[in-house]
Amino acid sequence: NIVDIPPVDGCDLLSTIDVGMQDICEKALTDKLKELNASVGVAVLMEVATGEVKAIVNMTKAGDGNYYEMRNNAISDMLEPGSTFKTASIMVALEDGKITPETEVDTGNGIMMMYGSKMRDHNWHRGGYGKINVTRILEVSSNVGVSYLIDKHYKDNPQKYVDGLKRMSIDQPLHLQISGEGKPNIKGPKERYFAKTTLPWMSIGYETQVPPLNILTFYNAIANNGVMTVSYTHLTLPTT
């Protein structure tokens, strides 16, 4: 027997996506991917005050050389965030009172040996930045500056650094209720393969994995005076 149950009016589910902004982002991303001959790219536009995602584009290069939307890389790809993670590292040290914006680091010629491995700034071949303060370290995205500070102040207690990251919820999923959402992987000192080099390299965005949308949400919270929020959809009551 087939039971036919009539629908009942409920809330309307509305997307936060702005079609015009989506088109602009798609073209901009595709053009840049072609210019760089890149394999995959993501572009997300978020409204600061509400955290609403106004545009989200995920492009992957196919076998025919063209770019297509194949998966939601922005929420599912577990990527090393690289230099975008430096802000979080500096914020932890600032909040713990370990440094101030004027704290200076001698980055030397742009190369610093750390536990037998070379930490390099991007301009090491031009002689590095020499002595610079924390503000300048962030401005020029100095690998040496950030890693030196975090290693200096947390090498005896790496868990305190990890706890600082967790205070900012950077290790938490966004709970978007969308299939395939990835959960950030922030390594702790009690885990396997947490070597002496892990902390300095982790501080500049390596040896850790975070989906792109999570990094955007973190920066959006900074712009939004510390309020972290993200939304793909919202509900509205049905009109009568």
Sequence positions of predicted segments:
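Extracytoplasmic/periplasmic proteins that interact with beta-lactams or build/remodel peptidoglycan
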Residues: 1-42, 62-65
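A short, hydrophobic C-terminal helix/tail in secreted or cell-surface proteins
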Residues: 236-240
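Beta-lactam-recognizing serine transpeptidase/beta-lactamase-like catalytic domain environment
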Residues: 2-4, 17, 43-78, 82, ...
